Regions:
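Conserved beta-strand position repeated once per blade in WD40 beta-propeller domains
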Residues: 32-34, 98-100
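Beta-rich carbohydrate-recognition and catalytic domains
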Residues: 1-28, 37-93, 104-167
């Protein structure tokens, strides 16, 4: 349903005419993250997909995007997989949570994982949604100065992340 493996980043430099000719943005782009199917009371079943914006050259995470697609109808008709919404400013912290997810349907949360490179080792961090909707508020699993883990609503600082790696 999409002819390309990514959606266009708002900072991408190619013109619409260049894209129509088949060119692909080589500077700013989004990489596909994970996705979930959410039963939205207003729209029925929707596919919620996280996209990670990457910086040209370094491929460093710089921002995020949440795009929602309709799952109403049947494959091949005009409504199925049509775009319902796109939030280009979604979780624009550049931390990349959601490259891998776990849906805890019994607990009512989606757990979102990211990694942070420390020398030659990738360290794991985790966040979770308040509900089974990716657009609901997120909490971040951090270890406080006493060594105890808990969930906090604010994005962790670099110091909090360093204390909170999951091993």
């Amino acid at each position: 349903y999409q002819a390309r493996t990514h959606i266009r980043h708002p900072k991408a430099s190619l013109s619409d005419a260049e894209i129509q000719k088949g060119e692909i943005d080589q500077d700013y782009c989004y990489w596909a993250g994970d996705a979930v199917v959410y039963d939205d009371p207003a729209h029925g079943k929707i596919l919620q997909m996280l996209w990670t914006g990457v910086e040209p050259g370094s491929l460093k995470n710089i921002d995020g995007c949440l795009r929602e697609y309709s799952l109403e109808g049947e494959p091949g008709d005009g409504q199925y997989m049509s775009v319902l919404s796109t939030d280009y400013n979604f979780k624009s912290d550049g931390l990349g949570y959601g490259s891998t997810m776990f849906e805890d349907t019994e607990g009512g949360h989606i757990y979102l994982y990211t990694t942070k490179q420390v020398n030659l080792v990738s360290r794991v961090l985790v966040a979770r949604t308040e509900t089974l909707d990716l657009g609901s508020p997120w909490s971040y699993y951090i270890r406080d100065l006493s060594g105890d883990y808990h969930w906090q609503s604010s994005v962790p600082s670099n110091e909090e992340m360093e204390r909170s790696y999951i091993t």
